[in-house]
């Protein structure tokens, strides 16, 4: 199976044999065509049959004895062709995206490359089954194997984070991180209860209650009363003293640790003390760092938190899903197990995505391996190498460095913003994102960029390679600064129009950078595709 593109059948799941075109050579020369990874096998159409052949592919008939019934072609409800025959337009788009991923220097901190095994599970027949409810308590029949799968996934989730199953439970059905967070709010809060999360411009996440002076942006801030805590702008570290003072006055029912652009560990003992002082629940959203937590290369939130949520596709390298871990003992008079499970279903969701749960089970098995721990150590060491080189090159980093998988670069001292840098780097096949930094006034034209190491570490980059990455970024920023000076207008739209016009005077420099980036990146394989 070519999992990313679905070019072949589920053959790799159902019969032995190696799929051609799905494995990279160790080292590849500079490419002009994505020949190795874009080689699709167009097999014959899969003609479904109810009795003599498998519905997924033309496999041998089952060994189970069946009546000798002839079925005419008129009785076959469909012909199961591959994607290339059925929808070449979608196939072409997927091919282009696959090419982009291969050529690009992928530095978005929330992205990663999952494994072929996860891809196979996600692309399996598990997607066909409805299973509202929990294992053993379904609203549909035919779920005996789905029950086995979800129970296995739950057990692996607890094992991956070294949790005692008598003290902790987990729900693996959330569709992603934000739905998981909102399920927690639904479970333990009433409408208009008070919450505190890290402010978005200071590294927090939308789902933690972000709002502006004019608008309640997040659904969390619409249904609950939100008060952010912030960083100490002089250090780039969470201002725990101010958090404690604000919590004492605001009296939140829930305090949320976790972030989307914070490069340091949280002080969980301090946050536990603050939460206890006001009678609040303490929740950790470890979406970005769950893989690092599983590998014990960052601080462990489970010792101090009542609830821990996460996505599954970032540093954990799984499918796009979510999980909610909860203590089994009642907290503040609430049975968290019952409350969380009921909030997920029937409160907010219907049937879970069983194909995702299958992929998650696969990734959680890998998360317990020595190889996974070694990988996470490289994620951190690569990020530190990147951070150190950026500092050498004159960049200002929020908090001065990194303890985890990302760095947040403040471009304002250079008279630059993240939106323009993101644009030029994207033109040069360097993919990262503009990001707010403490003190920013605009989320559309923020003053920073966020850079992450997980995806390119997955592809095999070393600390020395991330030094090269930093040099590429520096060159891109220098081009951006010159382009900003030459642009005819001061607005971002003027800049974007200018740099994409045929008359852009720096296009050859961008082209040169792009060619060198793609030559560099093309040496490293992508797993899973």
From Swiss-Prot:
It is found in: Plastid, Chloroplast. It catalyses: (6R)-5,10-methylene-5,6,7,8-tetrahydrofolate + glycine + H2O = (6S)-5,6,7,8-tetrahydrofolate + L-serine. Its cofactor is pyridoxal 5'-phosphate. Pfam families: SHMT. GO terms for cellular component: chloroplast; chloroplast stroma; plasma membrane; plastid. Belongs to the SHMT family. Homotetramer. This is Serine hydroxymethyltransferase 3, chloroplastic. It comes from Arabidopsis thaliana.
């Amino acid at each position: 199976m070519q999992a990313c593109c679905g070019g072949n059948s589920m053959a790799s799941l159902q019969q032995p044999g190696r799929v051609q075109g799905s494995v990279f050579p160790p080292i590849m020369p500079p490419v002009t065509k994505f020949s190795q990874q874009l080689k699709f096998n167009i097999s014959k159409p899969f003609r479904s049959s109810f009795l003599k052949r498998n519905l997924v592919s033309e496999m041998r008939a089952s060994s189970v004895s069946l009546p000798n019934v002839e079925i005419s072609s008129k009785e076959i409800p469909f012909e199961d062709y591959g994607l290339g025959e059925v929808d070449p337009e979608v196939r072409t788009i997927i091919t282009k995206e696959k090419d982009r991923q291969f050529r690009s220097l992928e530095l978005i901190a929330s992205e990663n490359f999952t494994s072929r095994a996860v891809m196979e599970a996600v692309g399996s027949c598990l997607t066909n089954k409805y299973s509202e409810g929990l294992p053993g308590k379904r609203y549909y029949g035919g779920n005996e194997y789905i029950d086995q799968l979800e129970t296995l996934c739950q057990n692996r989730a607890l094992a991956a984070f070294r949790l005692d199953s008598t003290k902790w439970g987990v729900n693996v059905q959330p569709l992603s991180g934000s739905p998981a967070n909102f399920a927690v709010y639904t479970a333990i809060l009433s409408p208009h209860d008070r919450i505190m999360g890290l402010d978005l411009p200071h590294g927090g996440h939308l789902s933690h209650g972000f709002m502006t002076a004019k608008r309640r942006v997040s659904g969390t801030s619409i249904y609950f009363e939100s008060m952010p805590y912030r960083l100490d702008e002089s250090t780039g570290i969470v201002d725990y003293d101010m958090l404690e003072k604000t919590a004492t006055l605001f009296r939140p029912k829930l305090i949320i640790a976790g972030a989307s652009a914070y490069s340091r560990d949280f002080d969980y003992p301090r946050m536990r003390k603050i939460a206890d002082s006001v009678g609040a629940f303490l929740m950790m959203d470890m979406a970005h760092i769950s893989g690092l937590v599983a590998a014990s290369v960052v601080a462990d939130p489970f010792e101090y938190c009542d609830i821990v949520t996460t996505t599954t596709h970032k540093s954990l390298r799984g499918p796009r899903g979510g999980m909610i871990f909860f203590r089994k003992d009642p907290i503040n008079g609430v049975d968290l197990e019952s409350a969380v499970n009921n909030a997920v279903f029937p409160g907010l969701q219907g049937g879970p995505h069983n194909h995702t749960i299958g992929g998650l089970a696969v990734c959680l098995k890998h998360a317990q391996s020595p190889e996974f721990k070694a990988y996470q150590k490289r994620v951190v060491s690569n990020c530190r190498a990147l951070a150190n080189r950026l500092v050498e090159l004159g960049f200002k980093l929020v908090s001065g460095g990194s303890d985890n998988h990302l760095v947040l670069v403040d471009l304002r001292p250079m008279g630059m913003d993240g939106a323009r840098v993101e644009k030029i780097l994207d033109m040069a096949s360097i993919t990262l994102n503009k990001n707010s930094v403490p003190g920013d006034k605009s989320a559309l034209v923020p003053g920073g960029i966020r850079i992450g190491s997980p995806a390119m570490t997955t592809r095999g980059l070393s600390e020395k390679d991330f030094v090269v990455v930093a040099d590429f970024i520096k060159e891109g920023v220098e081009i951006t600064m010159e382009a900003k000076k030459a642009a005819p207008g001061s607005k971002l739209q003027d800049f974007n129009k200018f740099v994409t016009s045929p008359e852009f005077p720096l296009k050859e420099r961008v082209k040169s950078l792009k060619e060198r980036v793609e030559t560099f990146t093309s040496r490293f394989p992508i797993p899973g595709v």
